[in-house]
């Protein structure tokens, strides 16, 4: 989402044209986030501190001279640079009061713009299209400057970008009704020219903006037809080949044709547009979401502006009448739910301005809206409030200030908070309280209200995006019960946190696991825990297996093995496996197996697991797989149970991430052999099932003649 704040006036502007319009050449950053350089169209350069709305320095050229290029700050030397009369360079420091005595250099060609980047020497763009570093020009100001542009071609827009730390100059030129894009690279030095075809005929480009991300330069263009178009340029493919033709694809459709306008790229999904129409004597500044093509914020200006727009430090600068106004803005990451106004991921900046719980209503002071037992609840809540007040803390009445109350008072307050579940602001309140408690715990390691966290998580109103530091705190505290509870409650746990929880569950000591309060009632119905010190134990039963259960038996494994025979073959009897890990640890690991994830994002984090953790996890996954395939009719209870598909998916991902490591481990051969035989047996089972399915399908297609008879008969069909 995006929003525009109230605008304010930064400075007045001089009138530099006969029609009374006030135009400026540019607004450029001045080193610090709160300072800008304003270059007017007459004779002056002024340094402003935006928050104070006051000038901190001003410099002017002589009468008869005119500034032809916006002043910029050289971030390397801290000096200001400006060009007057097209060819004359002036370089000075902030403490210089007179521009006449500043360093002067006269160049041999007209300058269009000077562009700067941090950690890069300033680049000078000439009107002929050539680009030179400032240092090389100062060594020989009268050196010959080449020409890149054709006759009648002029630069209408230019900007500098950073591509992996290297400067990238992009400028747009116009030749009659044709537009061309030039991209200058400097490592290695090369220039590429593109012929930009407009999306609609008879439309002109009013302004441009752009960005570089992942080796792709994206050019945004504002057309007089009211369209905002985008054109991608792969930076890695730029070379000195012949001119290429590219077309602009429509991105946004604004309201009808426009006379003048300005465009500025804010972030990867937001763009600011300033437009005016001939039908209305006013202009509109708006912020659009380019991902979902939605209008996020708008502001109307009653007076005409000069259709110029600059953006620095989350502030938009707009010449309005005879003043330069500043419009602060906020852009937050957007998703489809937030665009539709249904997002549950409430950001901190939004929380600060949201009205929270009505505490008078919470303690039951409005008996008319309460049910019949409201009187008893009211007395109970009043007793709790009075008891807390007797402890000498006033913070209980202000629940969002949880930084100074004791742990006992915190637990009492959370219990009182949960009584207001029916309040419309309950979810926001729980999120705010949780954020405050997490912040307090990180600042004070001795403060950790575990029971309060349990109650807050059990409300099922929290999510990872609402309180991202909560799971990190539980990982730091090794609080495995709360980690398990969050995994069951949060719908948006990222893969990196999911993998961190898995490693914590596998590596935490058995003493801490046994001490944790974990419900194992359901798990005990399908997990057989034997000797925990042994990796995998089998116990024999005296009876021979009469049937194959779900396609698995040790005999079939030995008969179908394609590997060399091992010294000690598996016994020809039914084998009952015992879980290689404790039942509480198994419950924790199961909470990982049933959590949602994206394989592409999870796989890189799985590679950080150690070899011991991988073997430990693989043994348990194999145990679960064999256990769930013992009998196809087993009904495993509960919703917190992994399915066979989930087990197989995790086993596959783990082997994909660590196969090269596992095959080098000495104790992994037997385990991999069991996995391979089990998978082969299942493949054979499903192959036979497919054959039966084909036979049944043929039988279904057979059309038997209808028989009218009062008697019934039984027909036996032999499949094999």
Swiss-Prot record:
Tell me where in or outside the cell this protein is found: Nucleus, Nucleolus
- InterPro entries listed in its UniProt record: NOL11, Nol11_C, NOL11_N
Q: What is its main location?
A: nucleus
Q: Name one Pfam family in it.
A: Nol11_C
Provide the alphabetized UniProt keywords. Activator, Nucleus, Ribosome biogenesis, rRNA processing, Transcription, Transcription regulation
Disulphide connectivity of cysteines: none
Q: Name one GO cellular component term.
A: nucleolus
What does the entry give for GO biological process? Answer: maturation of SSU-rRNA; positive regulation of transcription of nucleolar large rRNA by RNA polymerase I
Region (Disordered) location: 365-392
Molecular function (GO) terms for this protein are:
RNA binding
Q: Could you confirm whether the keyword Transcription appears in this record?
A: yes
Q: What does this protein do?
A: Ribosome biogenesis factor. May be required for both optimal rDNA transcription and pre-rRNA processing.
Q: What is this protein called?
A: Nucleolar protein 11
Q: Which organism is it from?
A: Xenopus laevis (African clawed frog)
Traced from the root, the source organism's taxonomic lineage reads:
Eukaryota, Metazoa, Chordata, Craniata, Vertebrata
């Amino acid at each position: 989402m995006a929003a525009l704040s109230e605008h304010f006036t930064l400075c007045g502007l001089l009138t530099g044209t006969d029609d009374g319009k006030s135009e400026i050449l540019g607004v450029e950053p001045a080193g610090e986030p709160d300072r800008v350089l304003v270059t007017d169209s007459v004779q002056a350069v002024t340094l402003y501190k935006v928050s104070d709305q006051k000038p901190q320095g001003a410099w002017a050229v002589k009468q008869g001279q005119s500034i032809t290029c916006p002043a910029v700050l050289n971030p390397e030397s801290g000096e200001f640079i400006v060009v007057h009369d097209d060819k004359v360079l002036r370089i000075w420091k902030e403490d210089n009061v007179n521009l006449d005595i500043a360093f002067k250099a006269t160049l041999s060609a007209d300058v269009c713009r000077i562009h700067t980047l941090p950690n890069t020497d300033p680049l000078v763009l000439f009107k002929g299209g050539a680009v030179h570093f400032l240092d090389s020009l100062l060594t020989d100001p009268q050196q010959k400057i080449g020409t890149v542009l054709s006759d009648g071609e002029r630069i209408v827009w230019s900007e500098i970008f950073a591509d992996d730390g290297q400067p990238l100059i992009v400028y747009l030129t116009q030749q009659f009704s044709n537009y061309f894009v030039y991209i200058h690279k400097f490592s290695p030095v090369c220039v590429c020219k593109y012929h930009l075809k407009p999306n609609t005929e008879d439309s002109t480009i009013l302004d441009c903006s752009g960005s570089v991300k992942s080796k792709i330069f994206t050019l945004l263009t504002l057309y007089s037809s009211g369209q905002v178009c985008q054109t991608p340029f792969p930076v890695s493919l730029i070379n000195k080949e012949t001119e290429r033709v590219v077309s602009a694809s429509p991105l946004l459709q604004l309201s009808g044709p426009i006379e003048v306008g300005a465009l500025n790229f804010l972030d990867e999904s937001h763009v600011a547009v300033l437009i005016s129409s001939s039908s209305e004597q006013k202009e509109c500044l708006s912020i659009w979401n380019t991902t979902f093509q939605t209008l996020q914020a708008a502001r109307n200006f009653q007076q005409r502006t000069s259709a110029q727009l600059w953006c620095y430090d989350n502030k938009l600068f707009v010449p309005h009448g005879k003043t330069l106004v500043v419009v602060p803005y906020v852009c937050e990451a957007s998703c489809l739910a937030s665009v539709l106004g249904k997002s549950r991921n409430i950001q901190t900046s939004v929380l600060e301005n949201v009205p929270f719980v009505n505490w008078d209503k919470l303690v039951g002071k409005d008996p008319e809206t309460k049910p019949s037992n409201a009187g008893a609840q009211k007395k109970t809540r009043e007793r709790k409030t009075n008891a807390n007040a007797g402890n000498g803390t006033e913070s209980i009445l202000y629940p969002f200030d949880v930084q100074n109350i004791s742990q006992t008072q915190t637990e009492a307050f959370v219990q009182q908070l949960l009584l207001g579940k029916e309040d419309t602001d309950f979810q926001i309140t729980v999120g705010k309280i949780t954020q405050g408690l997490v912040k307090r715990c990180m600042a004070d390691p001795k403060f950790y209200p575990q029971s309060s966290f349990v109650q807050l998580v059990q409300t099922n109103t929290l999510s990872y995006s609402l309180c991202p530091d909560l799971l990190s705190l539980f990982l730091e505290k090794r609080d495995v019960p709360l980690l398990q509870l969050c995994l069951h409650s949060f719908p948006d746990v990222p893969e990196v946190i999911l993998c961190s929880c898995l490693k914590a569950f596998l590596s935490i000591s058995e003493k801490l696991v046994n001490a944790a309060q974990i419900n194992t009632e359901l798990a005990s119905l399908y997990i057989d825990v034997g000797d925990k010190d042994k990796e995998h134990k089998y116990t024999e039963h005296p009876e021979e297996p009469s049937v194959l259960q779900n396609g698995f038996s040790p005999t079939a494994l030995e008969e179908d093995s394609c590997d060399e025979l091992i010294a000690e073959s598996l016994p020809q009897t039914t084998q009952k496996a015992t879980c290689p890990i404790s039942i509480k640890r198994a419950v924790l690991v199961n909470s990982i197996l049933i959590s949602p994830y994206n394989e592409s994002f999870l796989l890189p984090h799985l590679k950080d697991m150690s070899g011991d953790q991988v073997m430990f996890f693989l043994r348990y996954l194999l145990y679960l797989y064999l256990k769930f395939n013992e009998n196809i009719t087993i009904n495993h209870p509960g919703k917190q149970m992994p399915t066979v598909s989930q087990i197989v998916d995790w086993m596959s991902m783990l082997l994909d991430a660590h196969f090269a490591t596992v095959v080098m481990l000495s104790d992994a051969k037997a385990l991999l052999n069991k996995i391979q035989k089990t998978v082969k047996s299942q493949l054979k089972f499903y192959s036979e099932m497919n054959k039966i399915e084909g036979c049944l399908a043929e039988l279904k297609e057979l059309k038997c003649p209808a028989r009218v008879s009062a008697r019934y008969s039984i027909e036996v069909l032999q499949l094999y």
